[in-house]
Amino acid sequence: MAVKVGINGFGRIGRNVFRAALKNPDIEVVAVNDLTDANTLAHLLKYDSVHGRLDAEVSVNGNNLVVNGKEIIVKAERDPENLAWGEIGVDIVVESTGRFTKREDAAKHLEAGAKKVIISAPAKNEDITIVMGVNQDKYDPKAHHVISNASCTTNCLAPFAKVLHEQFGIVRGMMTTVHSYTNDQRILDLPHKDLRRARAAAESIIPTTTGAAKAVALVLPELKGKLNGMAMRVPTPNVSVVDLVAELEKEVTVEEVNAALKAAAEGELKGILAYSEEPLVSRDYNGSTVSSTIDALSTMVIDGKMVKVVSWYDNETGYSHRVVDLAAYIASKGL
């Protein structure tokens, strides 16, 4: 029986989680909460500038969405405590507003009747951070109720960092994510607490911070203090790429590094990590459902122990599929 899911925040990630859930028989979205009317939500769900028209019948009945004949309750509550998830049978809430990333705030969904909360972002004081393919085995249904799915960039980096560390040992590394612009930037020059993000997103390459590299330690504790990095926001609407330069414990060749990554992509990390030897560009990865695709043509090694690994990710679609996978995994372990 499908687990019943509510989505709080029907923005870029919320709607992409919904799209991903439509393809997963183990997930049933029964309600969404957003401070917008149902007609607007229906239009934005059906028509997407990045991912195209949704292959589903979408309409509105009163204040609710109707997708492929199934009615989905639409709420418009500012405070999660007032959502009464329990009354409508919601088991798991996907918290994707970006506003309730502290445990005490996200836990209000539990008070409203949900059994588990998945925060679709890095969180503070969460019960556990999980990256699928890396540390989902650490999930304890009795102890973990507010779970972070980390960031899209951590979901890209952690799987191949795991492979590199297990096979060759990572001494230290620096990561740059060349990242498409997001809603946390300004479309034209306007005030922002980060003065670089205050600048027009489509007009510049914008250096900014990311906690993604350090956050790998939350799912791979053995890498604590060994990774750091930054972001370069670029004028594309979707798809990003991680560039990791790391010092390894063992001497390697390009062929050995690629062979290890390819084996993982075809084996234990299939569906999470992919491997490509084609000369592709970012547009080719739009719609990719995996967390990370190794660009094997870009792998480099200097002096045996210094390695560069480049990996692509659809920072919307891939990440949203992992949110859905995590919800299904949590449900499979018992709520």
UniProtKB/Swiss-Prot annotation:
CDD domains xrefs: GAPDH_I_C, GAPDH_I_N
Q: Name one GO cellular component term.
A: cytoplasm
Q: Where in the cell is it found?
A: Cytoplasm
From which residue to which does the signal peptide run? none
Instruction: State the reactions this protein catalyses.
Output: D-glyceraldehyde 3-phosphate + phosphate + NAD(+) = (2R)-3-phospho-glyceroyl phosphate + NADH + H(+)
Give its E.C. classification number. Answer: 1.2.1.12
Kindly identify the residues recorded as the active site: C152
> Function of this protein?
Catalyzes the oxidative phosphorylation of glyceraldehyde 3-phosphate (G3P) to 1,3-bisphosphoglycerate (BPG) using the cofactor NAD. The first reaction step involves the formation of a hemiacetal intermediate between G3P and a cysteine residue, and this hemiacetal intermediate is then oxidized to a thioester, with concomitant reduction of NAD to NADH. The reduced NADH is then exchanged with the second NAD, and the thioester is attacked by a nucleophilic inorganic phosphate to produce BPG.
* Protein name, per record: Glyceraldehyde-3-phosphate dehydrogenase
- Please give the organism: Geobacillus stearothermophilus
- Taxonomic lineage of the native organism: Bacteria, Bacillati, Bacillota, Bacilli, Bacillales
Q: Which gene encodes it?
A: gap
